[in-house]
Amino acid sequence: MIQIVKSSELEKDWFSGRTFTGTNEVVQSVIEDVIQNGDKALHLYGEKFDVSSPKDFLIPESELKAAAENLKKHSPDVYDAICYSHELAYKFALKQKDSFDDFEVELTPGMFTGQNTIPVEKAGVYVPAGRFPLVSTVVMTVTPAVAAGVKEIVLCTPPRVHPEDKAAAEKAGTGIPGKPFTGGKPYADEGIMAAAYICGVKKCYACGGSQAVAAMAYGTESIPAVDVIVGPGNKFVAAAKKMVFGKVGIDMVAGPTEVFIIADSSADPAWVAADLLAQAEHDVVAQPVMATDDELFARKVSDEIEKQLVLLSTAQTARASIDSCGKIIVCNSLKEAAEIANKKAPEHLELAMKEGSERDDIQNIVCNYGSLFIGHYAAEVFGDYAAGLNHTLPTSGAARYTGGLSVRMFLKTVTTLRAQNGSEGMKKSAAAAGFLGDAEGLAAHANAARIRL
């Protein structure tokens, strides 16, 4: 059962960012192996960790198209949902891109300073496919790259046994964890392949884990090196992204998912419980939290969690999360709840409150969150799937200093300078640069400025 505590009982450690250790040495070894041995290393780790280790890694575009057509035929509702999600995400990303204006301004006579926004040339996307192949993650990671104007998008996702190889795999007793089918055709989860095609991916590789991150960072014979890598993954993928940062850009090092709900007594306990469980089912260490100033409401939500939980197919995972990481905080006021939320800096923050001045006040107080969901009808799962927002968000307190994945990740803001010979501004800048070069003891700097006078 979820723990109910008073705000005064919260321990300092609860506000600390959560870290998961024990991966660095293993992942560093994988990265070094991929750098030295390329595709050979990828095959080795595929045989060690995956259900399939294909002969080649690149999935033909025709296979992606076939997966999309198959999804449209047999699951039209899911196909349409992916298309709708992609459409909204693309519109939102374009709106974000439009907010980054290019300009040139004459700050002083004859000195023109400017700003240009340029897309990166190559972007790598990692899409996990463990217990729950995350079709929506394809939309959230690929779409902003497309909107940014990235020329080449490389998507890596764990391999699956190709349909044409399944008979051979079954006969050999392979194609299962611990006994991979080797040498077959490259293939992946069909939903991920379909979503990749819908979103415009042309290069999809059947390669997963930290080895895929290393391959995208450094390049192999088959998988090209990229400029940035985005997308979620397990602790090994997260560690690999952290280690390759610097060689490439990364979106963030994300941990287990979180939701923090500030609820008043007008909220429906069933709705709040449903939102908490939607996070809890992700992972046994997911962190579902609610804060309220109404103790009776807190107990109603707790009871509703128990009613709904037993009906879930994901009950085992959700139960572990609720019992070990879940929390309902009874506060002295909703303002205090907002202050606690700011200190926690959650991935998702919901204001399950009736419309009015109090909700407006709380909305003005909260400032540390990945995404904010305002009011009873703005369900967090809408942001997960189909509202235009990106669901790749900062966790473990990182919302204190950064936002989520956006089109910005795939854009570089660079600056320019143009100077008119003999202008007043050029003379003043040259003189100032000369004096500052002298002050810092950098004679060549001073000379490079004064030589133009």
Annotate the PLM regions.
Residues 1-121:
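N-terminal Rossmann-like NAD(P)+-binding subdomain of aldehyde/semialdehyde dehydrogenases
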Residues 3-8, 203-208, 328-333:
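Short acidic-hydrophobic, aromatic-tinged amphipathic segments that line or gate anion-handling sites
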Residues 105-190:
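Conserved small-residue-rich beta-alpha loop and adjacent elements
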Residues 151-160, 288-295, 375:
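Short internal beta-strands
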Residues 174, 197-287:
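Conserved NAD(P)+-binding/catalytic subdomain of aldehyde/semialdehyde dehydrogenases
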Residues 282, 290-369:
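A glycine- and small/hydrophobic-rich beta-loop-beta segment
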Residues 343-453:
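C-terminal core of ALDH-fold dehydrogenases
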